């Protein structure tokens, strides 16, 4: 049923909170492709008889493909709406993750993890843009709740994965979770839409504040923000991929490590609405400065304090993820603040490339550095990169102002974005 004055659906399908819930559910369904990997890494390594670095390279490749799929998928999302791209993304997650447990070679592992990663990139972009477009007045909070789904969504899966890994093995764990994730994503695709969209098609309304991807890539603001996002991701992705292997190197029990993975995901996801809300109140860049500064200090101290015992290890994981996770509420909303919403799906894909590039360190390279030079060296590198992000957010980005498109003059209030 349509509202004759607005042309919008009424009832549940016209309620923007319904679409925020769908966005969060989508994030929950793709969360495990990244955040449960640390549980799979050692069983996969043992099954294939290869090094940890070789297995973690699969994680890196998946992250890279996630970034590559977002601008391309975003083009079709911006042009036609989210439904058909979401169906394709869900099918890729289903096929890639379900069959990963059947691989008998490293190339097959890489191929299937990248297929799942490509699907994740498409789904992530759709979920985040659904939240941003339905909530232009509460963009930080909406982005935070949606990003929280990506961090927290893995939690219900962790006991299932741990149990199935012990009883039935890695193949069954991949298959059960892959089927659940893929099928639910495809079902959500039948009802999701953007505001102003009727049916499957979407019309783009472009204003002078909307930058297409080519225009955005020519602004210095994009590249400084990209560098900050790239820098702060080193430490978080190192821990995402390697918190369990690192904990084992400290001699921690398997039960402690399982609790640690749950805690890191709880704080990683739970912090995102909080930091999004804070950024709506005090500004994106001030919030970035606080988050990135604390993260740099935590990573510098991580190997010293985590070695003190079980509680210290879990506490450091919690603080590290509570700060790093905030970036996933801050950058999507900043992207829409500065470059507009008309092309936001494809534009955020270019921001996501920063995370993918940082994952090279978080996955195979980080594991190789830890193996050859020790974990202290790996954590020191991540502390330095988070400090770079802090410096950019504190001293550089706020002074740059808002980019101006096509010689359009903006008021001082418009130019001073947060």
Curated annotation (Swiss-Prot):
Phenotypic consequence of residue 66 to C: Residual activity
InterPro entries for this protein: MFS, MFS_dom, MFS_Riboflavin_Transporter, MFS_trans_sf, Oxa/Form_antiport, Oxa_For_antiport_fam_transptr
Gene3D superfamilies linked: MFS general substrate transporter like domains (1.20.1250.20)
Subcellular location: Cell inner membrane
GO BP: monoatomic ion transport
Residues that bind oxalate: 355
Topology of this chain in the membrane: Multi-pass membrane protein
Transmembrane segments: 17-37, 48-68, 84-104, 108-128, 141-161, 172-192, 222-242, 250-270, 288-308, 311-331, 350-370, 378-398
One Gene Ontology cellular component annotation held by this UniProt entry: plasma membrane
Keywords attached to this entry: Antiport, Cell inner membrane, Cell membrane, Ion transport, Membrane, Transmembrane, Transmembrane helix, Transport
Other notes: Its velocity of transport is the highest one known so far among transporters of organic molecules.
Summary of the function given for this chain in its UniProt record: Anion transporter that carries out the exchange of divalent oxalate with monovalent formate, the product of oxalate decarboxylation, at the plasma membrane, and in doing so catalyzes the vectorial portion of a proton-motive metabolic cycle that drives ATP synthesis.
Protein name per the record: Oxalate:formate antiporter
Organism whose genome encodes this protein: Oxalobacter formigenes
Lineage, broadest ranks: Bacteria, Pseudomonadati, Pseudomonadota, Betaproteobacteria, Burkholderiales
Gene name per UniProt: oxlT
